[in-house]
Amino acid sequence: MSFEIPRKQYAQLYGPTTGDSIRLADTELFLEIEKDYTVYGEEVVFGGGKVIRDGMGQNGQLTRAEDIPDTVITNVIVLDYTGIYKADIALKDGHIFKIGKAGNPQITDGVDIVIGASTEIIAGERKILTAGGIDTHIHFISPEQVPAALCNGITTMVGGGTGPAEGTKATTITPGAWHISRMLQAAEGLPVNIGLFGKGHASAVEPLAEQIRAGAVGLKVHEDWGSTTSSIDMSLRVADEYDVQIAIHTDTLNECGFVEDTIRAIDGRVIHTFHTEGAGGGHAPDIIKIAGLPNVLPASTNPTLPYTRNTIEEHLDMLMVCHHLNPDIPEDVAFADSRIRAETIAAEDVLHDLGIFAITSSDSQAMGRVGEVVTRTWQVADAMKRQRGALHDPSGAPHGSAESDNFRLKRYIAKYTINAAIAQGMADVIGSVEEGKFADLVLWDPAFFGVKPELVIKGGQIAYALMGDANASIPTPQPRTMRPMFATYGKALQQTSITFLSQAAIDAGVPAELGLQRIIKPVSGIRNLTKADLKYNGETPDIAVDPETYKVTVDGVEVTSQPSDVLPMAQRYFLF
């Protein structure tokens, strides 16, 4: 005998289901659930008098070795490039084990995930689950960036640096084997996944190759060290040999050539361009046109995301500090001014919305804010909906109902998850909510989505959480703030975080030589990438910049946006 209950009551008990919509934070973005893998009337819920008890929703006979998961997140809404759906998510051995319907098959049909005595439960009802974010533009200036990033849902940090040295404050580079070794050892105490860039500036192969063999996952070419065509070509030769990525910050002053010369030096080889709009650095005024090439994986940094009435004004001072410039030297001021163009910044948000710019990142403490990658990505999505209206898949493929924002949500979630992972050769391990992936996951209350997570899970264990006073009688009394949890302590940290290395470094025995105890994974599959491999962000139109007005056109049509006066996900969330 079936029993019907009102949809609102069902959502209160078990969370919303297929066809229901959820507002994300205080934005104008609405998520619609496309599929529900749970079974109506057979939902598993934990608590007093609830379903997950021995002999009911929990099987009391099977051991952990008999496919019993370590953790099940129940009835959670997944927002991922793979889809927007509701399911039970099982974690085992630090990985996503199964996605489907949890319960006890002895009493329930259609069970994919068997809950047992070895299983912990995280209640996902009325919550949203995303993959842990990946920030591919990290200046490792301060280790305090790590908790700031985790508190916004970032679980992987890729970049370079040695601390607050001038080279690091300006460039994402860990130069040479000695510094790479020390930073890999320092990463042993950081509860995030780590990958390091070496210095991509040499006129011979071996000074670059030795950094890859020392453990770098790629090389960074940066104008402050000289973004010359020879450095670009030599770095790409080494990258092709070792299957690593080259990240590039091109020549703002056009001293070594123009954007066309850089494109010729790249010569069709895959490359990851940083702050491709140009305010963060790059050929003035038209580096942005490189985003239309099929071998370029273009990223933005968050100082210019989203475009607001304050964006232009705040950039000059940031630039002077980050690039060791002197405000008393007219040439230094002119250099800074040349990078800040309202017209190209106004086009940047639109290029993200069109799927031309593919990745968002921070540029941490070097103009960007490491704890705002997720927030600012969704602020751009909201601004674009307000200014450009609904966004639908040009292929005509369905993504929920016509009223939902599902296609736009998949495009934007991909920018700091799967696409960042693909660009760095990490996508077989992290970057999405898929079976077999490392269990780096973020749980959000929809009202706080993109701003403050409820839980951050690293390698299957809770690393950070919204937690109340530790001396209180329950976990929820104010002040509730993001605090470190057990995955960040002791040896658990090393078993829940990954250090990415080149395959050459692993083959050379670097982990044993340095005494590394963390999980070690190689980057791979990079040199055969094209922009078409990026999810929901693979467009390659013709982009042009008027050399006099700086107006940007895409396939001959001008693209621009208006600066926002007010943003969602902002002051009302940060009163305390």
Curated annotation (Swiss-Prot):
InterPro entries: Amidohydro-rel, Metal-dep_hydrolase_composite, Metal_Hydrolase, Urease_alpha_N_dom, Urease_alpha_subunit, Urease_AS, Urease_asu, Urease_asu_c. One of its GO terms (molecular function) is nickel cation binding. It is found in: Cytoplasm. Its cofactor is Ni cation. Substrate binds at residue 222. Ni(2+) 1 binds at residues 137, 139, 220, 363. This is Urease subunit alpha. It comes from Paenarthrobacter aurescens (strain TC1).
